[in-house]
UniProtKB/Swiss-Prot annotation:
It is an enzyme of class 1 (oxidoreductase). NCBIfam families: QOXA. Residues 334-374 have a biased composition (Basic and acidic residues). Catalyzes quinol oxidation with the concomitant reduction of oxygen to water. Subunit II transfers the electrons from a quinol to the binuclear center of the catalytic subunit I. This is Probable quinol oxidase subunit 2. A lipid is attached at C20 (S-diacylglycerol cysteine). One of its GO terms (biological process) is ATP synthesis coupled electron transport. It is found in: Cell membrane. The gene is qoxA. The chain crosses the membrane at residues 43-63, 82-102. The keyword Iron does not apply.
Length: 374
């Protein structure tokens, strides 16, 4: 009995202490996260009511209709009312859950309503790090992000190695970043503060350290931050390539200029492999290689010249897209934005085509998997 009490006390304490944790998803600081919070709470309450009704009916049937020696064998009869209820009620439940879910999912793709024009930030994952390039401000950060409050931010998500998932729980849900693609994801912070961001898609041994901080500040403070960032060291191609290596420690860094001056990761997905060669980095399995030997051959200085702008993504030529190259002295003007919009539309077409193709393959596979003499 004492053992049972100890276990009960332990689990009870864990449950109570869990209430003291900061559940970021329920601590929304932006319009997208707020709509997700409503949907989650709505779904939980709805399903709790269903569970409560089912368990109550289950208990009633057990105690009221339990078998005893005086029980008579029941006879089944057709009952239109009961049959209607068990068909109609589940349909109503599915509709009640589907309508707000579908509406919210489609609303995610629309920029939050704001008087301010959206700010564009290129968010690139590589080497278990996050790189944030500000094309208009001409600055770039690593593992840290600063955004103005009450202004929508259009994140253009790209991956240079493994597929990752960009997630800031207090601002909105996650969206995948994939090699050879640029995916748009618009978020907004309604309050000032510091929030946590991370990669939510397991992608290797460095997954746990692929995190970043998000600083939401007033516009005046953001302008001051940009001014200070422009006084930092200019991001060179050598420095950028070195930061792409998983062997380079994860640090919060700020640079003047951006990597957009010399590479568009979506247009040149093979770029990172050349960066590996420049520093003699060879990928090794940490399960079979001692930790001290993983990066022993990596050099401090590049052994090859910097890579020139190239297009190794066949979709770019196929869809008439240009690499998004923006020099540090070039204006982020309407002409460049026009090319951005064109690329975004073509990327959406590519994504939709891939989804349709996968759905078609899945459908044909399901047909072939049916039983019979095949």
């Amino acid at each position: 009995m004492s053992k049972f009490k100890s276990l009960l006390l332990m689990f009870g304490t864990l449950i109570l202490l869990s209430g003291c944790s900061n559940v970021e998803v329920f601590n929304a600081k932006g319009p997208v996260a707020s709509s997700q919070k409503f949907l989650i709470i709505y779904s939980i309450i709805f399903m709790l009511v269903i569970v409560a009704v089912v368990l109550t009916m289950f208990a009633i049937f057990i105690f009221k209709y339990s078998y005893n020696k005086n029980s008579e064998t029941g006879k089944m009869h057709h009952n239109s009312l009961i049959e209607t209820i068990w068909f109609v009620v589940p349909i109503i439940i599915v509709i009640a859950l589907s309508i707000p879910t579908v509406k919210t999912l489609y609303d995610y793709e629309k920029p939050p309503e704001s008087k301010e024009d959206p700010m564009v930030v290129y968010a690139v994952s590589a080497g278990y790090k996050w790189f944030f390039a500000y094309p208009e401000q001409k600055v770039e950060t690593v593992n840290t992000l600063t955004i103005p409050k009450n202004r929508p931010v259009v994140f253009k998500l790209q991956a240079m190695d493994t597929m990752t998932s960009f997630w800031i729980p207090q601002l909105g849900g996650q969206k995948y970043a994939m090699t050879g693609m640029t995916m748009n994801w618009t978020l907004q912070a309604d309050e000032t503060g510091t929030f946590r961001g991370r990669n939510s898609n397991f992608n290797g041994e460095g997954f746990s350290r692929q995190t970043f901080k998000v600083h939401s500040v007033d516009q005046s403070e953001f302008d001051s931050w940009v001014k200070d960032a422009k006084s930092k060291k200019t991001l060179s191609q050598d420095e950028f390539d070195k930061q792409l290596l998983p062997s380079t420690p994860n640090k919060e860094l700020t640079f003047s200029g951006t990597h957009m001056a010399f590479v568009d990761p979506a247009a040149d997905p093979e770029y990172i492999f050349y960066a590996y060669k420049r520093y003699n980095y060879v990928q090794k399995d940490p399960n079979f290689v001692a930790e001290k030997d993983l990066y022993k051959d990596v050099t401090d200085k590049p052994q090859k010249p910097a890579r020139k702008v190239q297009i190794t993504n066949a979709n770019y030529k196929r869809h008439g897209m240009k690499p998004m190259i923006l020099g540090n002295n070039d204006p982020y003007d309407n002409e460049f934005k026009k090319e951005e919009d064109h690329n975004s539309k073509e990327m959406e077409k590519i994504s939709k085509s891939a989804k349709d193709e996968n759905a078609s393959k899945f459908g044909s596979k399901a047909d072939n998997d049916h039983g019979g003499g095949h």
